[in-house]
Amino acid sequence: KIVFFNGYYHGVSPWTQKLDYSGVLEEEVANNLYVNFNDYPALEKLFSDYKGEIAGLIAQPYMHGNFNDNFFPDEGYWQKVRKLCDDNGVVLIIDDVRAGFRMDLAGSDHYFGFKADLICFCKALANGYNVSALCGRESLKDVVSGITFTGSYWMSAVPFAAGIACINKMKKLNTPKLFDELGRELTTGLVKAGQEHGFHLIASGMPSLFYLRIADDDSLMLHQEWVADM
C-alpha cells in the first residue's frame, strides 16, 4: 500500500487520483491510504493499523496545492516521519517536481533536515525543457532496475544539456536565496497593490512558490476573473 496526504497533487496518472475521478478504476487506487499532512499521531495510527502492508509514503515537502493556503510542517515533523518509515521498512518518497531547487539546491528534503529514499525533480531542473529525474539511495537501484520502463525521448541531448547548464547556473546564482528575495518582493507588492484597490490578498507558502488568493472569495470566481484579466 501507498500512503498519500490529503490535498496532494502528484500528477494525473490513474493511481494518483481518487476513485470518483472520471476514468479511474477501483483496482488502480485499491492500495492507496490517505491521512492529513502534519498530523503525526494520525500517520502513526495509520502505520499501526496497516502494519506490514505499507510499501511507501509519497508526499510534497510542504502543502503547496491549489485552492487552499499553503503551509509548512511543524518543527521536527519530517524527522519523526523519517524514523517512522525506517522502523516500518517504508520507502519515503518526496515529490519535488514543483518545489525542487526553489528551497535548496540539494532538494527540499535537505531544506527540512531529513533524507528521502526517493526524490523526483522536473520543471526547474532544465528551465522548461522536457526532462525529469528520479534520484534515490544506492540500495534501491537494483529494485528499480528490475522495473520495465521505456520512453521515446531518452536520446534527446538538448534537454540533458539544458539541465546541466541550468543546474550550474542555479549554483552560480544561489537561486534559492535569489528566488526567496524576489518572491518576497513580488508578494509584498501584490498584497499592497490589492489593498490600494480594496482587495485583501493572502500570500502563503514559499515566496518562490507562493499561492495567492483573494480573501472572502469562497467561490473563487473573483480569483478567476482576476487571473483572466492578467
Task: Show the residue positions of the predicted features.
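Conserved N-terminal phosphate-binding loop of PLP-dependent enzymes in the Aspartate aminotransferase
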Residues: K1-M230
